From Swiss-Prot:
Domain of life per record: Eukaryota
Regions of this protein lying in the Extracellular compartment: 24-268
UniProt keywords, alphabetically: Glycoprotein, Membrane, Signal, Transmembrane, Transmembrane helix
Gene: GINM1
Cellular compartments annotated: Membrane
GO cellular component, one term: membrane
PANTHER family attached to this UniProt entry: GLYCOPROTEIN INTEGRAL MEMBRANE PROTEIN 1 (PTHR28549:SF1)
Organism of this sequence: Homo sapiens
Protein name: Glycoprotein integral membrane protein 1
Glycosylation sites: N46, N64, N166, N191
TM spans (from-to): 269-289
Amino acid sequence: MEGAPPGSLALRLLLFVALPASGWLTTGAPEPPPLSGAPQDGIRINVTTLKDDGDISKQQVVLNITYESGQVYVNDLPVNSGVTRISCQTLIVKNENLENLEEKEYFGIVSVRILVHEWPMTSGSSLQLIVIQEEVVEIDGKQVQQKDVTEIDILVKNRGVLRHSNYTLPLEESMLYSISRDSDILFTLPNLSKKESVSSLQTTSQYLIRNVETTVDEDVLPGKLPETPLRAEPPSSYKVMCQWMEKFRKDLCRFWSNVFPVFFQFLNIMVVGITGAAVVITILKVFFPVSEYKGILQLDKVDVIPVTAINLYPDGPEKRAENLEDKTCI
């Protein structure tokens, strides 16, 4: 797969930032106040599916993408940086008759890939551009085809939104298209919606994600029969292992980001210390030369007199033994 050309992507980022914000980015003028409220983008993604009879059905998938307090939400589900694949309930509009959309609207379960990428605009500043792209993979278990991607650009500083906009580009030219689907992060954790409670009108067939508890019971309204409780499937060991590895990777990155500056500071001190000591020793040798080393013990010259060994028994040890025997006999 080929991704978007780097030149066109850089040009879009430059135009997005430079046109409305060139004054306060370059001259230091007062920045525009953040937008009031969290930006909400209800985008419609055009997709096509294949019917059972072989005909092509055109549909629109409606996704509500919001940004609030440094977090991106897709249909109230939090999405982190990278490519995340989520399955959620959303509004789907059939496009056979665009003049009467109410009769063609229905809720379905879609599987969608969401790309969230953060571009730092300036070094040492909290100003950054958040790019969001989406690709619909399935609708109610059926594969879909998508030609265009709606890209959302949000310019933020200190978690405050300065401006946001969106535009459409071909799927083949998007960053999301160049990233393999094998590296997608599967959104499987339950109860991560920013909304604490679900509307009482929601039935078991309308839950966004499955709960890991034994059953999920619905609130029975007057005049409405309860549905069969939905029994959830426990998370598989593979998903748990993936979550552990992802947590380990984040902890390792955090540890290395903390140790890396300390290591280089220590290395800098060592290099500066050794270099400085060598320079100081060289200067001392130049200005204070030393002819001899005081640390070495030197001895005075002494005349050596040769000593000649005198043999007291010139006849040898055998003669000495005979003399001793003679003396004994006497």
